[in-house]
A protein has these predicted regions:
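Active-site HxH/HxHxD metal-binding segment of metal-dependent hydrolases
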Residues: 37-40, 57-134
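Short, basic, low-complexity termini and linkers enriched in Ser/Thr/Gly/Pro
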Residues: 1-8, 26, 47-61, 118-134, ...
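Flexible, gly/pro- and Lys/Arg-enriched active-site loops
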Residues: 160-164, 168-170, 175-184, 194
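Conserved beta-strand hairpin/beta-sheet module of binuclear metal-dependent hydrolase folds
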Residues: 4-48, 149-164
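Core dinuclear metal-dependent hydrolase active-site scaffold
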Residues: 22, 128-155
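Divalent-metal (often Zn2+) His-rich catalytic cores of metallo-beta-lactamase-fold enzymes
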Residues: 151-153, 159-161, 185-217
Length: 217
């Protein structure tokens, strides 16, 4: 495999302080969990991505969701319209994301959700890997049925890292008391994550980064 330059940028967006990540290489941008919840946050994200696009010709952008919860998708309708591309997520969480009003009602949020295009990430994985060859999709159900982690085992300027959504946090893990949660599945998913190299950096859906080695101790 050929190594390449990689950048990762974290934004903290919305009332749930959700981490949104932008991963960029020479010709691909992955926008992970478009959590921007207002105009200011949208402009902040747009300006950063526009700067990347202006410095690299023909760069392609994909939007990926680690799971279908509302706090990770506040800005999905805006982002899919802005960059004319769907949100890619695991098929098991698509019904949840399409029933966003139910999630709003569950949390008492008085807001009208906007629909946005969604596609099954597993049907697009070969296309993603063609531009980001070391990207691996890890299926990690438990917090939700379709939770996924994005694992990058190498890049010549960055340690291995994994974006874990709400599966694994610094000194914690995702709740399973929401619809679709399953503690047994979550434990299995955590055990699989703990088989990754100890120096793998964990970029979670909320809070600060950690490492696999620190969390499995």
């Amino acid at each position: 495999m050929t190594n390449y330059q990689l950048q990762i940028k974290r934004f903290v967006f919305g009332p749930f302080e959700t981490n949104c990540y932008v991963i960029s290489t020479d010709d691909r941008i992955l926008l992970v969990d478009p959590a921007c919840s207002n105009d200011y946050e949208q402009r902040e994200l747009e300006n950063y991505i526009s700067n990347l696009q202006s410095s690299i010709s023909n760069i392609q952008l994909s939007i990926v969701a680690t799971h279908g919860h509302l706090d990770h998708l506040w800005g999905a309708a805006w982002a899919t319209s802005r960059w004319n591309t769907p949100v890619l997520m695991h098929e098991a969480d698509i019904p949840m994301a399409q029933a966003m009003q139910s999630q709003y009602n569950l949390f008492g949020i008085r807001r009208q959700p906007e629909p946005f295009p969604i596609e099954n990430i597993k049907s697009k994985i070969l296309n993603l890997k063609s531009k980001m060859s070391n990207f691996e999709l890890l299926e990690t159900p438990g917090h939700t049925p379709g939770s996924v982690c994005l694992y990058f085992p190498f890049a010549n300027n960055h340690s291995p890292f994994v974006i874990t959504g709400d599966t694994l946090f610094h000194r914690g893990y995702g709740r399973t008391d929401l619809p679709g949660g399953n503690i047994g599945q979550l434990i299995d998913s955590l055990e699989r994550l703990f088989t990754l190299p100890a120096d793998t950096i964990v970029y979670p859906g909320h809070g600060d980064f950690t490492t696999i080695g620190a969390e499995r101790r």
